[in-house]
């Protein structure tokens, strides 16, 4: 639905403007700087992170989603149409993603 500008099938559930707002970084530079330990190359839209800088191969500017500290991640990349979902039971021990998550994202990015 988010990749289709708010449409699910033939139903418009969200306006295209709402989808743009959700998936656009809403943080100021100062806020991003304050959260850089956890938001490396990312900002925050409404309900999820938004990649703003290509820090790693999978950080494509515009990628939107959730990289949770409890081992779950779900992202969509509008420029490629890719959707990635990973569910594990490996809670994060700190701000650096686990090797499993990094390997998953690397593979999902075509690496």
What are the residue ranges of the model-derived segments?
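Catalytic loop of the DD-peptidase/beta-lactamase superfamily, centered on the K-T-G motif
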Residues: 1-111
């Amino acid at each position: 639905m988010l990749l289709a500008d708010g449409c699910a099938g033939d139903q418009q559930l969200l306006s295209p403007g709402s989808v743009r707002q959700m998936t656009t970084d809403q943080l100021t530079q100062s806020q991003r700087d304050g959260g850089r330990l956890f938001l490396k190359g990312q900002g925050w839209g409404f309900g999820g992170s938004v990649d703003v800088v290509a820090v790693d191969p999978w950080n494509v500017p515009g990628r939107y989603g959730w990289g949770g500290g409890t081992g779950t991640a779900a992202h969509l990349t509008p420029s490629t149409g890719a959707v990635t979902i990973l569910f594990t039971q490996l809670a994060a021990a700190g701000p650096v993603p686990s090797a499993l998550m990094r390997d998953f994202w690397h593979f999902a990015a075509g690496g």
